[in-house]
């Protein structure tokens, strides 16, 4: 197989309802800018996340909207972390 092949950095950040998640989004945006890298913000729906309070659910939604506003591709993946592993090779 002939090369050279295009290569580059990509950043993946997994978000939750934690109040500090918005800070993590901003940090990831700065890192992506420094690396000139595309970035993806994900949340994984599990049995635990389906039991979040309305306030926690709203906070997670706000954090995902912030990531999108700052240039991230955003994904909500139903299921367990194992599904994430099937997604990452294509990123």
Regions found by a protein language model. Give the residues of each.
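Small/aliphatic-rich secondary-structure junction motif
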Residues: 4-68, 75-76
